Amino acid sequence: MTHQQMLDLIQQLNDYSYAYHVKDEPIVPDAVYDRDYRQLQSIEAEHPEWIQADSPTQRVGEKPDSGFTNVAHTVPMLSLDNAFDNESLADFDQRIRKLLNAEQVTYCCEPKLDGLAISLRYEEGRLVRGVTRGDGLSGEDITSNIKTIYSVPLKLRTKTPPAVLEVRGEIYMPKEGFEKLNALAVEQGEKTFVNPRNAAAGSLRQLDPKVTAKRPLVMCAYSIGYVEGWEQPESHYAGLLQLSEWGFRTNDLMITAEGAQGCIDYYEKLNEKRASLSYDIDGIVYKVDQIALQNQLGFIARAPRWAIARKFPAQEEMTRILGVDFQVGRTGAITPVARLEPVFVGGVTVSNATLHNKDEIARLGVKVNDFVIVHRAGDVIPKVVQVVIDKRPENATEVVFPEACPVCGSDLEQVEGEAVIRCTGGLVCGAQLKESLKHFVSRKAMDIDGLGDKLIEQLVDQQLVKTPVDIFTLSEKKDTLLSMERMGQKSVEKLLASIEIAKSTQFNRFIYSLGIREVGEATARALTSYFTELDDLMAADQETLVEVEDVGPIVAQHVRLFFDQELNRDTIKGLLAAGVVWEKKQQVSADELPLSGKTYVVTGSLSQFSRDQVKDKLQALGAKVSGSVSAKTDCLVAGEKAGSKLTKAQSLNVPIIDEAGVIALLTEHGAI
C-alpha cells in the first residue's frame, strides 16, 4: 500500500468513527471498521514514519456533537483492545501472566452489550449527572434523559453511600422493545431504526426527555469508574455484586474464569446462547478480576492493559446486491430475495437475503448493484437492513416487481391494508403446493418422518402428489418410489410405515396441518378445544369463531374463507377417507382444566419425551406454555443443559422442576 492509500484509509476510518461516535448513525458494520482498523495498524507497524496525528490508532474517539453540554470525565472512559480468535486471547493471557509473574490469572467475563456507554455520577448516594462516553475524555451531559430510564437508580439503596461514585454502564434496547418501536413507527408512517443499538443511541440523545421516556431503554452497569469515601472491593466481580445491591442492573451471565481456557470455554458457551438472548451482544469483555493486579498492570496509550474484548462473528456485514429473485410461499406470498456477493456474516457465508416485500424495497430505497448492510443472527433468515447510499454505483438499477406469479403465471393480488402481494393460483401453483406439503408433513403438524423437502419437490415435479391426500396413496406407487433418487428399499418401507402411523393424529395437529392463514399451533389448539367436532368448526360463522380465545376478526375471516373453498373441503374429505383419524375428546371448559391460568416454560434436553411433547401435554391440561422466562412464569421445566432460562428463573425465584418432576405432574393429572 502506498503512503497516499494509507492517508485515504485514515480519512475513511475517521469518517466511519465520526458517524458512529458523534452522529450515532453508523454507516458500516463494526466488522468493516475493525477489519480496516487492523489493516491500518499493520501498515503503521511496517512504516512507523508514516503515522499521522489524526490516525484513529492515536486517539480514543471523536469530539461530541454540540447539541448537549460537554462534561469532562473524572477518569477517562478508554477503549479496549480486541482479540479476534483463541490464539490472540491466549497471547493476551500469556502477556498478563508474564507481566505479573503468575502461573494463572482469574478473569471476570462479561457479555459485551451492543448499546451506548455512559457514566453516572452519584454524590452522597444521589444521581447528579449522566454523561455519554464521547471521545473518552469528555462526553455529553444527558442527565435529564438518563433519569427517565427506570433501571437507573436515582438514589443508591444504602444508608452509607460513598461520597462520590461514578458508575460505568451500557444503555441498550431489548429486542422485543425494538420490534415494538419499529412497528409503531411503521404504523405512524415514520422512519424505522436499523438495529437496537441505533434505536438506543437515537432515543438517548433526544433533546426532549419526554421522547426518551417513551422508549424501552435499559441500563446495565459494568464497572466502577471512580470513587471517594468508600473502600472498593478487592475484585471487579465483587464490585459488580456491590453495585447490584445498591440498585443497579448487572448482567446475570457474568462469571469468573481461570486462565485462557476458561475464557475460551465461556466464549463458546455464550456464542451458542447469543441468538436466544433478549438483547444484542457483540462479544465478551475479559478483565483481570483483582483490582490490585489491574493497578499493577496499568494502561497503554488508548486502553487498559488488564482488559480485552473478543468479538463474536459479525451479525452485520457490507456486500453488493447482484440481483433480486421472487419466491412464492405456502400462502402465495411473493417474497423478493436479494442475490448477494457471498459474505461471511453471523458465522456462515450468506449469498441470499430477504427484502420482505415491495413496501420494504421502497422504504430501504434499494437498487440492484447497491452496496447494502446484511444482518444475520442465529438461525434467523438473513435480511437487508440498510443501503450504503455513499457507495451507490452509476449502474444501480430499480428493482422491478413481477406483474404475474413468477412460478405459475397466475394473477397477483394485494389485500387493502396488507404489505404482502400474493399469487392467486392456490395449489395449482407448484411453489405453493410444495410449501403447503412441507407444512402438512412437518413435525408439529402430521409429523411424517422421512418425507423431507427434497423428496416432496421430486414428488410434485413428477406429479405423483398434487394434494395432501395423495401422500396417503403413495403405498400404491411403491415401485415408482424405489426408482427415485436416494430411495432404497429400507427408505421406502420406513416412509410408508411413517405415513401409516401419521393417520392416527390429534385434532389440533390436523387443523394446524391444513395451513389456514393466521392459524398457528396455539390458535389450532384453541379452535379444537372450543369445537370438539370437525363439522361444527367447518360450519361456524365469523361471529361464533371470534368467541374462541385468541381468535380475532382477521383470524375468523381466514378460517371462514378456508372452509368456504370447495377445494379445501374436498381435501379434508379425502384425508378422512384415506384413514386419517383422531381421538375425540369430551369438551371441557378451560377453567376446569387442572393447570388453567398457569404459565410454564420448557427448556433443556429431555430424555423420555421431546420438549414439544411435554408442551403439548401441559397445554392439554390447560397451561399456557411460553418461550421465555419472566416474573409471570409459574414454573420452569428444566432438562439437561438448561442454560440462560434456568439462570433467569433462579434470579426471579421462579419454581423449577426437572424431567422427573414434570413426568410426576403429568402422571398425577392423567396426561401420561
From Swiss-Prot:
NCBIfam families (alphabetical): dnlj (TIGR00575), PRK07956.1 (NF005932)
PROSITE patterns: BRCT (PS50172), DNA_LIGASE_N1 (PS01055), DNA_LIGASE_N2 (PS01056)
CDD domains: BRCT_DNA_ligase_like, LIGANc
Name of this chain's protein: DNA ligase
Annotated GO MF terms: DNA binding; DNA ligase (NAD+) activity; metal ion binding
Binding-site residues, NAD(+): D30, A31, V32, Y33, D34, S79, L80, E110, R133, E170, K287, K311
Reaction catalysis annotation: NAD(+) + (deoxyribonucleotide)n-3'-hydroxyl + 5'-phospho-(deoxyribonucleotide)m = (deoxyribonucleotide)n+m + AMP + beta-nicotinamide D-nucleotide
Family that this chain belongs to: Belongs to the NAD-dependent DNA ligase family. LigA subfamily.
Swiss-Prot/TrEMBL keywords: DNA damage, DNA repair, DNA replication, Ligase, Magnesium, Manganese, Metal-binding, NAD, Zinc
Names of the cofactor(s): Mg(2+); Mn(2+)
Protein's gene: ligA
Protein function: DNA ligase that catalyzes the formation of phosphodiester linkages between 5'-phosphoryl and 3'-hydroxyl groups in double-stranded DNA using NAD as a coenzyme and as the energy source for the reaction. It is essential for DNA replication and repair of damaged DNA.
Superkingdom field: Bacteria
Cellular component terms (Gene Ontology): cytosol
Binding site for Zn(2+): C405, C408, C423, C429
Organism: Marinomonas sp. (strain MWYL1)
The enzyme's E.C. designation: 6.5.1.2
GO biological process, one term: DNA replication
Domain BRCT: 590-672
Active site residues per record: K112 (n6-amp-lysine intermediate)
